[in-house]
Amino acid sequence: FPTRRSSDLEDYISDMTIVFDDMGYLTLKEGSKPLAFGTEIGAFVRLDDLDTGYAFKEIDRSIFMNPDKINARLVMPVASYKDIIKGYPIDLFLYANNYEEVKDDIGEIDFFKNAKDAIAVCKKGARMAKGTTTELGLVTSYFANPFGPVQKQELVNVLIDKYFDDLFKTGVKVGQIRTSLGVKGQEKDGPKKAAKKLFELIIK
């Protein structure tokens, strides 16, 4: 990041690497923060979720699926293999809360005081489904996973406790970010405001 301050966020960013779009995994490392790895070099995204014109700038590198229909998707490359397998220490771990409206007493970002509270929110998996899958409206599912039945929860619960305890013990900030993506009228401005708050937190 440059040393000078500016209202233009781009002045702070020289490069950005996407380690994983929506599928990755964590490993514990003794004596340090958990590490994050990616599992894929591309992203499978909704056309409507991208900035206007961005997808078409990448048209020669992307695969478009039904671009004329609702929930049109595209596959596009976002990272190299060497980037996703490197393993990056985690500094910040946030649950994406897209359904709560940001108000005077409810900010875009807040942090959990302990692992128990963080686990409760993640296990509940509340989110405002926008019809991108078979779900619609405010729904809940184990770790917000809308695909298929949850399996082997008893085995997974042991891992969840272990990993969240390690996040807190190693000083990782664990919380939630309210994107307002599922709040009517805030679909565009909400995520932008949340992103700015996140950026302000990062550069502190």
Provide a role label for each language-model segment.
Residues 65-204:
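Conserved NTP phosphate-binding and transfer environment spanning the P-loop NTPase/kinase superfamily
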Residues 1-6:
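Short, small-residue-biased leader/transition segments that mark boundaries at the very start
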Residues 12-83:
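Conserved nucleotide-sensing/catalytic segment adjacent to the nucleotide-binding pocket
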